[in-house]
From Swiss-Prot:
Enzyme kind, highest EC tier: isomerase
Organism of provenance: Mycolicibacterium paratuberculosis (strain ATCC BAA-968 / K-10)
Entry protein name: 2,3-bisphosphoglycerate-dependent phosphoglycerate mutase
Family annotation (PANTHER family): PHOSPHOGLYCERATE MUTASE
Chain spans, region Disordered: 119-138
GO biological process, one term: glycolytic process
A molecular function (GO) term: phosphoglycerate mutase activity
Lineage: Bacteria, Bacillati, Actinomycetota, Actinomycetes, Mycobacteriales
Gene symbol of the encoding locus: gpmA
InterPro entries documented for this protein: His_Pase_superF_clade-1, His_PPase_superfam, PG/BPGM_mutase_AS, Phosphogly_mut1
Amino acid sequence: MGETATLVLLRHGESEWNSLNLFTGWVDVGLTDKGRAEAVRSGELLAEQGLLPDALYTSLLRRAITTAHLALDAADRLWIPVRRSWRLNERHYGALQGLDKAETKARYGEEQFMAWRRSYDTPPPPIERGSTYSQDADPRYADIGGGPLTECLADVVVRFLPYFTDVIVPDLRSGKTVLIVAHGNSLRALVKHLDQMSDDDVVGLNIPTGIPLRYDLDARLRPLVPGGTYLDPEAAAAGAAAVASQGRG
């Protein structure tokens, strides 16, 4: 690589369950019309700012895959290589998957709700195998025994960072502009690593849907601008505030 490498992070556009304020995790829901528009706009922002990706990485969940496709189409980059991995999936929310966030907070209280939702190392109760929103019969996860039954953010760090180091970093070091289209918590895990955030500080990190976040990295893959730079800062601030408020109503 040269003196710097360019990495762009993009959380998927608004999903059907984002709009309903439900815990989603590994449940494979699609995008809303708003989410699709966010995805297209993110690709337009990339093109407008000349930030054209050479390689794309995403998860195995349709809300991220669809966002990636729409963004690449809008940026006229549908032809670049795309790699998908479960290691970029959203955090598994265990038995909370499919539950309304506000109702969950009312039932268990603010402290427990926030510990499950935002803490670094407190996983929700595990999901039961064979239940409606489990993934144990999903062929995508046959090689990993159906996937986890629950996760905290620390678990996402453990599964994602080796993939980032072993698979994505070589593209960055070769000079490619890399776009990662993933999820709120898988991206929080990566930002924690890039910015060397403490376990306590990452609790307050909120990543909005559908707005590209640019990181220019030095030779040690440390950010030249801590926290990166959103391509639409005003929309990003509003979106992050909306994420922070989920479950409060």
